């Protein structure tokens, strides 16, 4: 659960002496309940952390690469336990654990080939597993009806793949502690842009809807100039 190598590198007596249990009194009931429900390390169904030990564990992970580990860990601990500074949720979840993934968000571009698309979805699943939020640019993926050279067939466009990505984020939640978070991005010139804008609707074919995924349409200055000038806008794949 906790990185034993990291623990062995610290003088735990020094860190224990720095813990101030009186700081537990700064919590509201709701804050303490949230900490207990979502953030404490647990073994099976048993929580094995207390609030100040939790903050020290996070601080130890953050100070791991510092020259004077104990001094920096205590400095980080005091910042966290006083609420003067608070790390992001993945850092609080994972610092000093066997999977020290500390970043909140990961951005990627999905390539225009089948293997690359599913490699991207697999990467999303693994990142979500360890509490990472996800943002994928789908602009490179060809649109519906586009020729596929390898099979001499026609592409189904981005929407079916977005449905798979949406369901992956639902299936692989963030460390079992909160729902997966994913956002799909598409540029305004893409031929599938109109269907993309319908993804969150509650009507229509549910197989072409992504109710759990956020969507974002990248709009360049040129598009807005065309709108102001009442000119045409070209879509392509």
Language model: regions and residue ranges:
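Extended catalytic cores of very large enzyme megasubunits
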Residues: 1-237
């Amino acid at each position: 659960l906790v990185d034993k190598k990291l623990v062995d590198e610290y003088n735990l007596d020094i860190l224990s002496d720095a813990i101030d249990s009186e700081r537990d009194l700064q919590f509201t009931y709701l804050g303490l309940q949230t900490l207990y429900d979502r953030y404490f390390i647990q073994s099976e169904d048993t929580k094995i952390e207390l609030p100040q030990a939790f903050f020290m564990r996070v601080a130890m992970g953050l100070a791991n690469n510092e020259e004077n580990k104990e001094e920096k860990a205590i400095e980080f601990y005091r910042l966290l336990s006083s609420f003067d500074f608070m790390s992001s949720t993945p850092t609080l979840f994972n610092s000093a654990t066997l999977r020290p993934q500390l970043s909140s968000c990961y951005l990627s571009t999905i390539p225009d080939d089948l293997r690359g698309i599913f490699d991207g979805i697999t990467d999303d699943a693994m990142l979500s597993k360890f509490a990472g939020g996800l943002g994928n640019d789908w602009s490179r993926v060809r649109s519906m009806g586009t020729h596929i050279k390898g099979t001499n067939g026609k592409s189904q466009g981005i929407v079916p793949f977005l449905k798979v990505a949406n369901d992956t984020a639902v299936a692989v939640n963030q460390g079992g502690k909160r729902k997966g978070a994913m956002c799909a991005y598409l540029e305004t010139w893409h031929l599938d842009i109109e269907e993309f804008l319908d993804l969150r609707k509650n009507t229509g074919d549910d197989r072409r809807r992504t109710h759990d995924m956020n969507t974002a349409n990248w709009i360049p200055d040129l598009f807005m100039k065309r709108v102001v000038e009442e000119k045409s806008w070209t879509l392509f794949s």
